[in-house]
Amino acid sequence: MHLKLACFLFLAFPLIAQGILVIDVRTTQEWQSGHLEEAIHIEWQDILSISESVSKDKEIYLYCRSGNRSGKATKILIDAGFINAINAGSIQEANNLLKSKIIK
């Protein structure tokens, strides 16, 4: 299992307890400026790094700054067989959708 992913999953936030994985696909600098509490950070072009550690039927929400990169990452995951990959749009849209909070 990807070590970064395992560490975050171990810290079981409410969405993770429901079986939902939230991924912030922005740059490291954007991530450090604030991210959803339950999110893990994987830049969009590295999204397939989860393929060996996450079930293909897991509910996965992806977000970025505007929804563009998360859309690309969602397509990559869907093309790889992840049937429940969802583009949650921008960080604000994802925050509203998932009823989370933004932390720094």
Ranges and model annotations:
Residues 13-19:
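Sec/Tat signal peptide C-region and signal peptidase I cleavage site
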Residues 3-13:
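Sec-dependent N-terminal signal peptides
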Residues 63-64:
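Metallo-beta-lactamase
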Residues 2, 19-21, 28-59, 68-104:
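Rhodanese-like catalytic fold shared by cysteine-dependent sulfurtransferases
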